[in-house]
Amino acid sequence: MANNSNSGSELEVDDTLQSICYNRGSLKLLDQRKLPLETEFLDIRNSSDGWSAIREMVVRGAPAIAIAAALSLAVEVFNFDDFTGTSNDAASFLFKKLEYLVSSRPTAVNLSDAANKLKEVIYKAAATASDSNSVFQAYIEAAEIMLKDDIASNKAIGSHGASFIQNQLKNPQRLSILTHCNTGSLATAGYGTALGVIRALHAAGVLRRAYCTETRPFNQGSRLTAFELVHEKIPATLVADSAAAALMKDDQVSAVIVGADRVAANGDTANKIGTYSLALCAMHHNIPFYVAAPLTSVDLSLSSGKHIVIEERSPKELLNSRGGLGEQVAASGISVWNPAFDVTPANLISGIITEKGVITKIDSSDFDIKNFVKRTAGQSVA
């Protein structure tokens, strides 16, 4: 990938809180591995660059990687000057590239969901187009709509979540929220999911304090979430992952809000490793535990979380400091187990906050997500 440090006037200061900077034919991704100490954008010229950026954690967060993948291919086909195939050839090319991009990170359903939706656009375009350029144009426009829709979706999640939590909790004027990993502007096209709810609570004047975990081993909480909270001037405290239970015991947490990489039909949720531990602690201390995610994170094809494929990351992330980017800190020869995600069972989750509203349980332990999706299918995001 070409390297383009942020030293000119093209990218303004506030863009440091945008992981995706796109204009038709051009895509730059903020290298989140270097935050918060260095701001650097990488030029993404094609789907190969996009795959590498996602796999190597240049960009992360389920919504963000879906958008980045789609746009990396949009940039590639926009800049084609030597494609001589038919409309069907163009469709075949796009299908193969989308499958390739989906393989970059298998746990996040947003990526495969975006690919499937884009394939539908490609099918329709190829059936009526007279040339390859028309198919490529249809794809580019669809990818750009996804970028726009993600921002609107995130703001709706924030609004629904803030209203719901204020109505559910005691003393809603003095809320302290604990979150895990990074679910803000850097993990999405903008605003954020779980962190978007925290932003909305702060804007409403009811947030006393946000707590963010460091989120080892890649430190998305200490490097990214803390960075966003400081930038937004939201009162916040960083805690070690291992301090979360003690924080809850000391009655410092009103609710826990996390994001999601994949939600099964029954509500079981795959999210950053350590989420399950937080949910167990929250239940023990009678603290509500919420998942905030767009409906694109829901995978109705999976009946439960036992079917979710969990990505395992490089041992180097544990063996070396700075999530694998620094010097070795562990003994040579030690074996490593480094799952990127865990699955929190639905019985530990109080509600799932989406852009269409909050999914609550039909009884003590079960969510009827299929019915919620069906019931809100024609409902606009607001």
From Swiss-Prot:
GO MF entry, a single one: S-methyl-5-thioribose-1-phosphate isomerase activity
GO CC annotation: cytoplasm; nucleus
GO BP annotations listed: L-methionine salvage from methylthioadenosine
Keyword annotations: Amino-acid biosynthesis, Cytoplasm, Isomerase, Methionine biosynthesis, Nucleus
Places the protein is found: Cytoplasm; Nucleus
Site (Transition state stabilizer) location in chain: 181
Pfam families referenced in this protein's UniProt entry, alphabetically: IF-2B
Catalytic activity entry: 5-(methylsulfanyl)-alpha-D-ribose 1-phosphate = 5-(methylsulfanyl)-D-ribulose 1-phosphate
Active site: 261 (proton donor)
The EC number(s) this enzyme carries: 5.3.1.23
Keyword 4Fe-4S found: no
Pathway: Amino-acid biosynthesis; L-methionine biosynthesis via salvage pathway; L-methionine from S-methyl-5-thio-alpha-D-ribose 1-phosphate: step 1/6
Alphabetized PANTHER family for the sequence: METHYLTHIORIBOSE-1-PHOSPHATE ISOMERASE
HAMAP family per the UniProt record, alphabetical: Salvage_MtnA (MF_01678)
Job description of the protein: Catalyzes the interconversion of methylthioribose-1-phosphate (MTR-1-P) into methylthioribulose-1-phosphate (MTRu-1-P).
Family: Belongs to the eIF-2B alpha/beta/delta subunits family. MtnA subfamily.
UniProt protein name: Methylthioribose-1-phosphate isomerase
